[in-house]
């Protein structure tokens, strides 16, 4: 067999080997003095431990500790040691899933007693005790039947094996020849590299993320090859906690949830509603300037509508159960595409009518498993900045450029930094995955590449990632917590116009199907507000801040309160969100305005009244400034107008 080894310097070495060989043996064949930093390898792109056997032609790449996959394999090894520790301390516990998540690891297990944070400390101490000696983490691979027999006393393991192993071998990890855990990842072969770790929390987690299943206990932790880097990670986690939009949302009274209303259904409080409303006003104005026509469509749609669009067949699991009344079945809409198609179809269209740009700030409902719900990031009710543009094929290039320019302008104003751009294209060799029209695909993809070059944009081509119905362009950002998300999207759809028989009359009096451009501006308001909260740590720019000015009278004299009220009314007349905070000592009130991150606080006392001016302090600054009211209003109005 022929094995191509991609060296760390990028060069390729080819070996012709007769018999099966492990990654470790191959590494030793390359160099007798094995680099101890190499801990795994990829076999045709799949991560494997060093003792995995190579049996046929393959492309191999060795993985070092500081590689991204190196962190993954270390984390999974930590999860195995944690599973072993739990079984030693609580023999009746049933280990379900040990896995990794971003730069951390976790273990889900079933145990009759709820473990406390005090017990978490004892578990960590026991792990450290176990790790004094080098523990073997041995991979054991069996047939499905053998694996089911081996794990017969663990119903969770049995279910996992049945769900994830249709054919072929199923591997488990045997830790210290005592604890056997069904594998859901790849672990290091022994514990020698596991020196620096920290258990973070013990929480509840539903089996397989489904709230209809049993609730298990989950222990989460982090680890690293370096003590210094582990400390850095812990500091970073603390910073992430302080930036978590769920924490900030509660502290700043932005939003709340209540299970009596329904899981995953966000409730915007007055402060949150101000942010949402101001964002909407800004985006509506931008869309107006870019020639969009706003529409409003029902939050319900008939099942027949979604059957015709194809969503019923391909998206049904993410839709709520239909409401059956009389002879009709209605469903809460998960998207507006079919509704906007009905608007297009409501009139006869000429080629001169296109592009037709429809926008809607649309309330949508999508079913998410309760275990996946995460604050405002993953919800069941959301409002989307949605648009569908109906264009002729020859207009695609120009319309794409307009869409991107609008997106770029909005993201710049909102201080959102683009991480990278991706262009999802079809795989021409896969004739079943994509709508079958080679000419249309080739022309569309060529046009998109040309316009991206004209805009001088760097992008990542993603072959095989296009939707069934057309190519897709995504704007990716990295949140303050390090998550990569798609913030904006431009997607071309050749298929939906055909499904709904949408046409326009061309210059030769022929009926032609338009192309639909799906344009997402900032995604949903819910997720975008979560992103903003975490990015700015709850400190909004003046124009977006829910509470812009706090007036703090030093005393309760009649003339002081009269002056404060006069300031209040004048600021409100200038559309500045202003309030008087008069209860409590002046010190406590100053602390409150800082805690609530109000951009400006005005102090009013006898001196300010006598001189007919005011003393203000900006959030985050220690020094106060004395100005006239007109100077103050001019300063703030300029900031609001310029969105700074």
Where are these regions (language model features)?
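NTP/phosphate- and nucleic-acid-binding module
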Residues: 1-77, 81-96, 102-644
């Amino acid at each position: 067999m022929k094995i191509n080894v991609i060296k760390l310097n990028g060069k390729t070495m080819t070996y012709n080997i007769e018999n099966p060989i492990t990654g470790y043996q191959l590494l030793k064949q390359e160099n007798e003095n094995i680099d101890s930093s190499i801990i795994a390898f990829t076999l045709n792109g799949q991560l494997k431990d060093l003792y995995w056997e190579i049996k046929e032609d393959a492309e191999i790449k060795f993985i070092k500790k500081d590689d991204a996959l190196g962190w993954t394999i270390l984390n999974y090894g930590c999860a195995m040691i944690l599973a072993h520790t739990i079984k030693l301390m609580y023999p009746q516990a049933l280990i379900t899933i040990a896995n990794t998540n971003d730069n951390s690891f976790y273990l889900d297990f079933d145990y009759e007693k709820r473990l406390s944070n005090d017990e978490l400390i004892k578990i960590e101490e026991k792990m450290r005790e176990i790790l004094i000696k080098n523990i073997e983490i041995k991979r054991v691979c069996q047939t499905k039947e053998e694996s089911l027999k081996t794990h017969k006393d663990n119903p969770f393991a049995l279910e996992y094996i049945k769900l994830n192993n249709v054919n072929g071998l199923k591997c488990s990890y045997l830790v210290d020849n005592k604890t056997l855990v069904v594998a859901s990842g790849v672990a290091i072969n022994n514990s020698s590299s596991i020196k620096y770790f920290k258990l973070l929390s013990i929480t509840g987690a539903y089996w397989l993320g489904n709230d209809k299943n049993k609730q298990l206990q989950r222990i989460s932790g982090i680890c690293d090859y370096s003590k210094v880097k582990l400390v850095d990670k812990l500091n970073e986690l603390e910073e992430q906690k302080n930036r978590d939009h769920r924490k900030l949302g509660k502290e700043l009274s932005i939003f709340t949830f209540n299970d009596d209303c329904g899981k995953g259904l966000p409730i915007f409080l007055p402060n949150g509603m101000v942010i949402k409303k101001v964002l909407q006003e800004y985006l509506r104005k931008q869309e107006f300037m870019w020639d969009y026509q706003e529409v409003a469509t029902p939050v319900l749609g008939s099942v027949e509508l979604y059957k015709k669009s194809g969503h019923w067949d391909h998206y049904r699991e993410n839709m709520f159960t239909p409401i059956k009344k009389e002879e009709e079945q209605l469903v809460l809409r998960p998207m507006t595409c079919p509704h906007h198609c009905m608007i297009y179809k409501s009139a006869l269209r000429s080629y001169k009518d296109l592009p037709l740009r429809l926008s809607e700030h649309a309330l949508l409902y999508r079913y998410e498993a309760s275990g996946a719900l995460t604050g405002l990031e993953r919800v069941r009710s959301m409002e989307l900045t949605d648009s569908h543009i109906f264009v002729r094929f020859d207009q695609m290039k120009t319309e794409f450029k307009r869409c991107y320019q609008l997106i770029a302008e909005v993201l710049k104003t909102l201080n959102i930094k683009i991480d990278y751009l991706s262009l999802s294209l079809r795989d021409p060799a896969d004739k079943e995955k994509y709508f079958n029209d080679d000419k249309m695909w080739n022309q569309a993809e060529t046009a998109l590449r040309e316009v991206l070059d004209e805009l001088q944009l760097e992008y990542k081509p993603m072959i095989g990632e296009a939707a069934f119905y057309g190519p897709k362009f995504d704007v990716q950002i990295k949140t303050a917590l390090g998550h990569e998300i798609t913030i904006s999207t431009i997607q071309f759809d050749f298929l939906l116009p055909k499904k709904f028989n949408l046409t326009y009359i061309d210059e030769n009096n022929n009926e032609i199907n338009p192309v639909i451009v799906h344009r997402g501006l900032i995604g949903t308001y819910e997720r975008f507000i979560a992103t903003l909260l975490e990015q700015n740590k709850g400190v909004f720019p003046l124009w977006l801040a829910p509470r812009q000015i706090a007036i703090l009278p030093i005393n309760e004299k009649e003339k002081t309160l009269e002056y404060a009220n006069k300031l209040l009314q004048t600021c409100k007349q200038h559309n500045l969100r202003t309030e008087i905070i008069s209860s409590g000592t002046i010190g406590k009130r100053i602390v409150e305005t800082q805690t609530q991150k109000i951009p400006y606080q005005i102090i009013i006392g006898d001196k300010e009244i006598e001189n007919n001016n005011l003393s203000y302090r900006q959030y985050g600054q220690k020094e106060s400034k004395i100005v006239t009211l007109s100077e103050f209003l001019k300063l703030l109005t300029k900031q609001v107008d310029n969105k700074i």
